[in-house]
Amino acid sequence: MAKKLISILGLTLILSLSVCACGEEKSFLSATDYELDAETAQTIRGVKIGDDSETFLAAYRDYDILSSINGGDYRFLPVEEIPFTSSLTTILPSFFVDGSAIDLDSFCEENGIEKESLLSFLTDESYLEMHTVLYQYLLFTWENGKITDIRSESMDYNRDGSYYEAN
């Protein structure tokens, strides 16, 4: 079930970020930004359960944030439009190739592929023989303007890529 969720979130990331503003300088989270303190569930940027949108945005406003309102589909919203007081889940996703976060638009352009084909491209056996591919995201659950849960999840496509070939 978790692998299927990660697969869906990966595809959602690809499709949702296609509506992001073009030509803007993008910031990328590093692999260490996805680490959580095991005891406090605090992110490396100091965000923890119980924090509000002000603390969250101070740490993550410059990054791509996908939002799911009341359990709906994840979509990109400008930070000023994210309804933090609703029942909300936000994710900060990244694909890493050979240890570096990738800009999806640039990656697709450089490799001559359509965004809709990115997941197939990244999970292709011949590509995985030459590269390491990791999908990571931080997931924040919100209720009444406060963070109620934080999780860091990932999918190592080199280890688990065969799952995607079958689905």
Regions found by a protein language model. Give the residues of each.
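A cross-family detector of function-defining hotspots
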Residues: 27-28, 32-37, 42, 48-167
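Bacterial N-terminal signal peptides that target proteins for export
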Residues: 1-9
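Bacterial signal peptide processing site
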Residues: 23-25
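C-terminal motif of bacterial Sec signal peptides marking the signal peptidase cleavage site
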Residues: 18-21
